[in-house]
């Protein structure tokens, strides 16, 4: 064996050994949102499972602000040693870089680990809206262009883009009314001041079950575990390409060893099989999922392209 070959072999063995011994001290999980937000809760549920499996504390560190970019930037600037992870989500990574300059590069600054949740949205309107299903809803909007308004939690928010995509694919015209958060955006639909929106299942399910809103479908192509009796919009409106929502995942700073990412991904995939975790996610309005680092990387790229396409085609801009 040459000296070079011996060096490479020794390096590989050393890397594997480090991964097998990982973690040997507490791991910090940066959540770029305040406590109690959906990404925060999902990250905590997964962190508990990782802590049980790997016998080290996984400590949640909330770094909220600037639409998630402050915490995201703090995570990517941390040492790539596996001891700082990020509870990543669609807003800061898939959407924000298309709307404004961010201090991180979504294509270069992350080492993907695994998805942990898909966040379905629901098309909702006031119970008095003159339609009983998605096709009737679309037909009514087409017959009344620009008569109706749709709300969102803010210009450029997931709900805004997801509703704009629906409007485009369904070939309907309505006026956008942005709010500061999903709660007031839904309150004015409940009150009859706004026509409709497509907002997270977590935010809408209480209103739907309470009879204050009615729904015509959910946003992913497949039905969601949280409302299995409600068809997808793709199914109900005959829009097979309509397949979109938000996501939550775990990533690490770029440069984190592949072995560490694979180890964490494997533990997350095992955790996601637990029935208690699946039920917890359903109660949060999410679907528990997992994948490999390579699959996560491909998913993140696809989501960036999807949201970027919506922003460009609809000419969406936010005030800087």
Predicted regions: what is each one?
Residues 1-8:
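Bacterial N-terminal signal peptides that target proteins for export
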Residues 8-9, 233:
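N-terminal secretory/targeting leader peptides
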Residues 14-17:
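N-terminal signal peptide c-region/cleavage motif recognized by signal peptidases
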Residues 19-109, 147, 155, 171-200, ...:
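N-terminal (or domain-start) structured segment
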Residues 24-26, 172, 209, 258-320:
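An extracytoplasmic/periplasmic, membrane-proximal ligand-sensing/linker region
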Residues 77-84, 90, 98-184, 233-235, ...:
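Hinge/capping helix and adjacent helix->loop/strand transition within the periplasmic-binding protein
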Residues 91-101, 160, 165-169, 196-230:
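A ligand-binding cleft/hinge motif common to bilobed small-molecule-binding domains
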């Amino acid at each position: 064996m040459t000296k070079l070959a011996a060096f490479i072999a020794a390096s590989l063995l050393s890397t594997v050994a480090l991964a097998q011994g990982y973690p040997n001290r507490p791991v910090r999980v940066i959540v770029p949102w305040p406590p109690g937000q959906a990404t925060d809760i999902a990250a905590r549920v997964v962190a508990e499972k990782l802590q049980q499996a790997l016998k080290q504390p996984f400590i949640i560190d909330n770094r909220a602000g600037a639409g998630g970019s402050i915490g995201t930037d703090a995570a990517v600037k941390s040492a790539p040693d596996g001891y700082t992870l990020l509870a990543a989500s669609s807003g800061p990574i898939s959407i924000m870089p298309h709307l404004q300059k961010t201090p991180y590069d979504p294509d270069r600054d992350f080492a993907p680990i695994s998805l942990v949740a898909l966040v379905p949205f629901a098309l909702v309107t006031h119970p008095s809206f003159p339609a009983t299903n998605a096709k009737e809803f679309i037909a009514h909007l087409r017959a009344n262009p620009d008569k109706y308004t749709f709300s969102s939690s803010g210009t450029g928010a997931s709900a805004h883009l997801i509703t704009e995509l629906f409007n485009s694919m369904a070939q309907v015209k309505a006026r956008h009314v942005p709010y500061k958060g999903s709660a007031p955006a839904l309150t004015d639909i409940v009150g009859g001041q706004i026509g409709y929106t497509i907002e997270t299942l977590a935010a809408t399910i209480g209103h739907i079950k309470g009879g204050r809103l009615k729904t015509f479908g959910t946003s992913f192509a497949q039905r969601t575990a949280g409302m299995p009796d409600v068809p997808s919009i793709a199914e109900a409106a005959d829009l097979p390409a309509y397949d979109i929502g938000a996501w939550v995942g775990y990533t690490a700073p770029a440069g984190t060893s592949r072995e560490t990412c694979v180890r964490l991904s494997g533990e997350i995939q095992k955790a996601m099989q637990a029935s208690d975790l699946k039920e917890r996610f359903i109660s949060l309005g999410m679907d528990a999922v997992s994948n490999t680092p390579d699959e996560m990387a491909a998913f993140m790229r696809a989501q960036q392209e999807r949201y970027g396409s919506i922003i460009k085609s609809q000419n969406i801009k936010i005030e800087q």
